[in-house]
A protein has these predicted regions:
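Non-ligating segments of multi-cofactor redox enzymes
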Residues: 1-194
Length: 194
């Protein structure tokens, strides 16, 4: 088999059903009017609940700021009509920003060309995780590019259950500490009476 180079960018997919947004207890992660998902740094408490809620692993925690960070789809730029920095800087024109319908039409046409040449090409992002705002035209299977074949967005119920489990564990810890202190005070009183 012949070896070949395959390239792909990897950043936030701005999921239509964003697990990170659903998991954030302070609502620091929001969807803008243009559909991109951003972290409001002034509201983020650094709890990291969003990190395991992202099936793509593209959210990181900054020890320096104590908050999470991810691609904003160049929120400031797109709200000023400038497009994304990555699409402007891409030397091959492979990364594009624009109207979703136009981009899908271009991708579908290119996919048809690649398939006609016998390529194993596919579009990733139309159906994955209930649809992504960022999609890819891959020349091979998604896992070759480091993407999950069948990404699953954690259900809100699971995130809530995790939170309940954490709170229950904290409650048990506090109860054990109170019990220990009461027992310790009880033994001190016995020693004083003797």
């Amino acid at each position: 088999s012949q070896k070949r180079w395959l390239f792909s960018s990897d950043s936030c997919k701005h999921c239509k059903d964003a697990g990170c947004l659903n998991a954030c207890p302070t609502k620091a992660i929001v969807r803008t009017d243009l559909g991109n998902v951003i972290v409001q740094q002034d509201t983020c408490i650094g709890c990291k609940f969003c990190i395991p809620s992202c099936p793509y692993g593209v959210i990181s925690f900054s020890e320096q700021s104590g908050t999470v960070h991810k691609c904003t789809l160049c929120n400031d730029r797109i709200h000023n009509g400038l497009g994304t920095a990555c699409s402007k800087a891409c030397p091959t024109g492979s990364i594009r920003y624009g109207e979703l319908g136009d981009l899908k039409n271009r991708a579908d046409a290119r996919l048809a060309q690649l398939k006609a040449r016998g390529e194993r090409a596919q579009i990733y992002g139309y159906r994955e995780a209930d649809g992504l705002q960022v999609f890819y035209l891959f020349a091979d299977l998604p896992h070759i590019y480091g993407q999950p074949e069948n990404p699953v967005v954690p259900q809100r119920r699971l995130v809530l259950c995790s939170l309940v489990t954490i709170l229950a564990a904290l409650g048990i810890g506090v109860a054990a500490l109170v019990n220990f202190r009461e027992r310790l005070q009880g033994t001190e009183e016995v020693h004083h009476e003797s």
